Amino acid sequence: MKITLITVGKVKEKYLRDAIAEYSKRLGRYCKLGIVEVADEKTPEHASDGLERQIKAKEGERIAKHIRDDAFVIALAIEGKQLTSEQLAAKINDLGLHGTSHIQLIIGGSLGLDPAILKRADYLLSFSKMTFPHQLMRVILLEQIYRAYKINAGEPYHK
């Protein structure tokens, strides 16, 4: 299975980059992992709704260039479905059993994802009703993907 994260912006903090590298290494046993970073747009402190829509649209265009037609696309969004770790593991397993060979997971920038990306997604996933920094969300998502593979392999880790 190929797993690709499509993310907006670069990870600036070393401790987050280290965690991403660690989970990427661990996942190498289970899947082929790729991470695509698209440029983020500078957002002024008190941006108007119209400007925020424009920023999300620009970031959305950059994301869309990397979405593959043959991939199952999961977008992270507050309005998405919340799953337990076991349910996420089952979702990944079921996708593989039904012939999916590539899953793309999309993490938006500080303003979230453009509606066009949400519409294109095959599945909307939410980790919480709360908002998380998108850089930290990469670590959380990679950890949960790793946990899912450990669950599916019946290996100790997730309890």
Curated annotation (Swiss-Prot):
Annotated protein name in UniProt: Ribosomal RNA large subunit methyltransferase H
PANTHER family documented for this protein: METHYLTRANSFERASE, RIBOSOMAL RNA LARGE SUBUNIT METHYLTRANSFERASE H
Description of how the protein assembles with itself and partners: Homodimer.
Catalytic activities: pseudouridine(1915) in 23S rRNA + S-adenosyl-L-methionine = N(3)-methylpseudouridine(1915) in 23S rRNA + S-adenosyl-L-homocysteine + H(+)
Function: Specifically methylates the pseudouridine at position 1915 (m3Psi1915) in 23S rRNA.
Organism: Bifidobacterium adolescentis (strain ATCC 15703 / DSM 20083 / NCTC 11814 / E194a)
HAMAP family: 23SrRNA_methyltr_H
List of residues binding S-adenosyl-L-methionine: 76, 108, 127-132
